[in-house]
């Protein structure tokens, strides 16, 4: 009988990976719990603003703060000129150094929209956003806005759909 010299090595690695997956997946699943903290309508983006509070965007246009300890939820007013249609609405939100950045589908008039990004100083009652980016040209569509935000080394990164 001829045995490939790599056969034993392949079997050894296969068994090692198999046992790792079998035993580690069980231990991961035992420590994972899922709790519904708030009744939200189409939540899209979220970011911790403290150890206890999470700010959340709802695609339908609301921004809410949820206290994950007390489970208290309250809505924050804002001045965004958003457009809810298809995949459009309020999208991602990110917090850093007492500022918020949000991506959203902006109503540019005459059924034209764009993916836009705005910035505001954190205020838990009323957010006064100022646009820092508007995709050009605005188009007549309710689809493919994207969008996720990330901050790295004081740079704001944003993804968008193929608009």
Residue ranges and their predicted role:
Residues 28-163:
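Acidic, Gly/Ser/Thr-rich repeat motifs that build Ca2+-stabilized beta-propeller blades
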Residues 13-14, 78:
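Hydrophobic alpha-helical segments and their boundary regions
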Residues 8-10, 17, 71, 96:
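A generic signature of intrinsically disordered, low-complexity regions enriched in glycine/proline
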Residues 16-17, 27-28:
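Cleavable N-terminal signal peptides
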Residues 1-11:
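N-terminal secretory signal peptides that target proteins for export/translocation
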């Amino acid at each position: 009988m001829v045995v490939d010299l790599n056969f034993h090595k392949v079997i050894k690695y296969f068994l090692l990976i198999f046992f790792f997956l079998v035993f580690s997946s069980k231990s991961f699943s035992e420590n994972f719990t899922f709790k519904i903290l708030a009744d939200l309508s189409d939540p899209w983006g979220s970011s911790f603003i403290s150890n206890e509070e999470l700010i959340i965007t709802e695609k339908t246009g609301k921004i809410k703060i949820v206290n994950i300890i007390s489970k208290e939820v309250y809505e924050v007013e804002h001045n965004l000129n958003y457009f809810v249609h298809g995949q459009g609405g309020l999208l991602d939100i990110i917090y850093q150094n007492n500022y918020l950045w949000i991506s959203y589908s902006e109503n540019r008039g005459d059924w034209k929209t764009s993916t836009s990004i705005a910035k505001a100083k954190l205020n838990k009652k009323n957010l006064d956003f100022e646009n820092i980016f508007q995709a050009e040209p605005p188009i007549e569509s309710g689809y493919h806005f994207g969008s996720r935000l990330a901050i790295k080394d004081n740079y704001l990164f944003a993804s968008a759909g193929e608009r």
